[in-house]
């Protein structure tokens, strides 16, 4: 997965 996509998914999981 692209780094930005992974970061987005992780960010949403934190929220």
From Swiss-Prot:
One of its GO terms (cellular component) is extracellular region. GO terms for molecular function: hydrolase activity. Keywords: Hydrolase, Secreted. Signal peptide: none annotated. Found in milt (at protein level). Its main location: secreted. It is found in: Secreted. It comes from the Eukaryota. Coiled coil: none annotated. Its EC number is 3.4.22.-. Cysteine proteinase that hydrolyzes basic proteins, such as histones, salmine and clupeine but not milk casein. Shows a preference for basic residues at P2 and P1 positions. This is Miltpain. It comes from Oncorhynchus keta. The lineage of its organism: Eukaryota, Metazoa, Chordata, Craniata, Vertebrata.
């Amino acid at each position: 997965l692209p780094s930005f996509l992974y970061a987005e998914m992780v960010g949403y999981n934190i929220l």
